[in-house]
Amino acid sequence: MNHFSKKVSVSLMALVMVAMTASAGTNAAKSTKTSGVNWNPVMDAIIQVESEGNPNAVSGKSVGAMQITPILVKDCNDILKKQKSKKRYTMADRYSVSKSKEMFLIIQKHYNPENDVEKAIRLWNGGVKYSQRSTNSYYKKVLAQMK
């Protein structure tokens, strides 16, 4: 497959994923939905790419199934504080898959209100100021896991 065909295939796959997640619905767990999007397929793919599903994975300052950093925990807590929520996450919560998924949803709701699947994946890998180029490989790996 040539380079152009690969790009078209990835783009089409991304569009299909957006359509599928946007229409996924009523059977999805309430805690994994924001504005009608079922984030479970994205989160599950990220978990496979980040840690192969290992909730005890450690790589530098990143830990848990979703490889959460202390900076992300602080960011989630800052967002919750601004929302006047009393809920806060601890560093130990990074080892909990369910709490890691909650943090993912907080980040997406705050930084990705349009619920763009591609942005969600790139944002998770590269942070708020991610670049397209630096997150390309990661984005492709997550999409491949979502097949």
Which positions does each model-derived feature cover?
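Extracellular/periplasmic catalytic domains that process cell-envelope and extracellular macromolecules
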Residues: 36-39, 59, 114-117
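Short helix-to-loop capping/linker segments positioned immediately adjacent to catalytic or ligand/cofactor-binding
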Residues: 54-55, 111
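Short, functionally critical alpha-helical segments immediately adjacent to catalytic or ligand/cofactor-binding
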Residues: 38-54, 68, 104, 119-127
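Residues that flank catalytic or metal-binding motifs in active/ligand-binding sites
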Residues: 42, 61-64, 138
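Short N-proximal segments of mature Sec-exported proteins
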Residues: 50, 58-75
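N-terminal secretory targeting signals
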Residues: 1-41, 140, 144-147
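Alpha-helical segment that forms one wall of the substrate-binding/catalytic cleft
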Residues: 70-123, 128-131, 139-147
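Short, solvent-exposed loop/turn and secondary-structure capping segments
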Residues: 57-59, 134-135
